[in-house]
Amino acid sequence: MYSFEDIKVFDPELADSITMEIARQNDHIELIASENFVSKAVMAAMGSPLTNKYAEGYPGKRYYGGCEFVDIAENLAIERAKKLFGCTYANVQPHSGAQANMAVFFALLQPGDTVMGMNLAHGGHLTHGSPVNFSGSYFNIVPYGVDDNGFIDYEEVEKIAKECKPKLIVAGASAYARKIDFKRFREIADLVGAYLMVDMAHIAGLVAAGYHQSPIPYAHVTTTTTHKTLRGPRGGMILSSEEFAEEHKLNKSIFPGTQGGPLMHVIAAKAICFKEALDDSFKDYAGKIISNAGALANELTARGFNLVSGGTDNHLMLIDLQNMNITGKEAEHILDEANITCNKNTVPNDPASPFVTSGIRLGTPAITTRGFNEKDMAVVAEAISLVVKDVDKNKEQAKALVKMLTDAYPLY
């Protein structure tokens, strides 16, 4: 197991950067929707000697010797993932959600095939068809988006699907604050003879806890990350039925298709994460993520902020700042000066460039892990409001509110 003291002795420059990052995490309110704080057990697994072991292949079928013990770790992760999400197949080797998505695309499609995915500018993800990503480079992408109220228009999705006849429809998002109807997506996919892939990276923890409709009964294949609302190590995973996975060789699409050796220390951390999520306490945690998000959304609305779709059903919200006469880039910067961390984000029909944006995305998974409750959301909203409306006048007052909360809820 690693010791931070060893790092300080051998590489004080790097140790300084880690120390400063620990301080930042402790002293800032973390509102990036895709970030969370892992448990000490998850962190310990990632710093374990399992990082030393090469294990190309799968449990019982490795290309290296000496894998009998890392096989135990991977099998634990697989069985726990299947139990957690109620499926018969799980591949826990993807290094990221993006690589899980890539593996599924290459397993089900040929270059040039048509794919429908949510428009990145409307809340989708790079890997759902952005032209700068592999998905937009190798495949013919037909995007769908949200209506003028910020909701997915399923009738419009069906209309587009009938017109373009995709081979694959991707459901899921990175900046969509409402529940997604996976059953409706499957009906549309069946109507046009398409596969349905659900990327539940952002909502996996909410699905596991029963607070969002599970895609497992409806999707041909589901991908996810293991961090975000699931609160595990940074990594990816593919879920499906054993029959579909075998027919389409999903395992081979990960190894040797898109990856070499798996990261056994991360897979061990995934196993711990899944065990944590199977505990009854995780359901309570996920419920608090949603209640905190709802409370924060209400408090921000009361202070004049414009929320895309008017609110949230999950862990995140998208704030359109055009009525505040400030860009997303500017808001991200000045909030960071007040020790509030968030990210700039495009809003539907955004007139600004993706490097500037007209909005910010906020999420509650990390602050909920820390212990923040619904009453605290009024303080968080007030700090945000003070900074966005007049940073020069109000920054110190906002920082004092932030310090009051971070002192009340120490991180580690």
Swiss-Prot record:
Q: Which cofactor does it need?
A: pyridoxal 5'-phosphate
- GO CC term, one of those recorded: cytosol
Top-rank EC class of the record's enzyme: transferase
Compartments it resides in:
Cytoplasm
MF (Gene Ontology) = glycine hydroxymethyltransferase activity; pyridoxal phosphate binding
Known catalysed reaction(s)?
Answer: (6R)-5,10-methylene-5,6,7,8-tetrahydrofolate + glycine + H2O = (6S)-5,6,7,8-tetrahydrofolate + L-serine
For the modification N6-(pyridoxal phosphate)lysine, the affected residues are: K228
Site described as Plays an important role in substrate specificity, positions? H227
- Tell me one Pfam family matched here: SHMT
Q: Where (6S)-5,6,7,8-tetrahydrofolate is bound, by residue?
A: L120, G124, H125, L126, S353, P354, F355
Similarity annotation:
Belongs to the SHMT family.
Q: Which HAMAP family match?
A: SHMT
Function field:
Catalyzes the reversible interconversion of serine and glycine with tetrahydrofolate (THF) serving as the one-carbon carrier. This reaction serves as the major source of one-carbon groups required for the biosynthesis of purines, thymidylate, methionine, and other important biomolecules. Also exhibits THF-independent aldolase activity toward beta-hydroxyamino acids, producing glycine and aldehydes, via a retro-aldol mechanism.
Assembly behavior: Homodimer.
The identity of this protein, by name, is Serine hydroxymethyltransferase
Q: Which organism is it from?
A: Lachnoclostridium phytofermentans (strain ATCC 700394 / DSM 18823 / ISDg) (Clostridium phytofermentans)
Where is the organism placed in the taxonomic lineage, from the top? Answer: Bacteria, Bacillati, Bacillota, Clostridia, Lachnospirales
Q: What's the name of its gene?
A: glyA
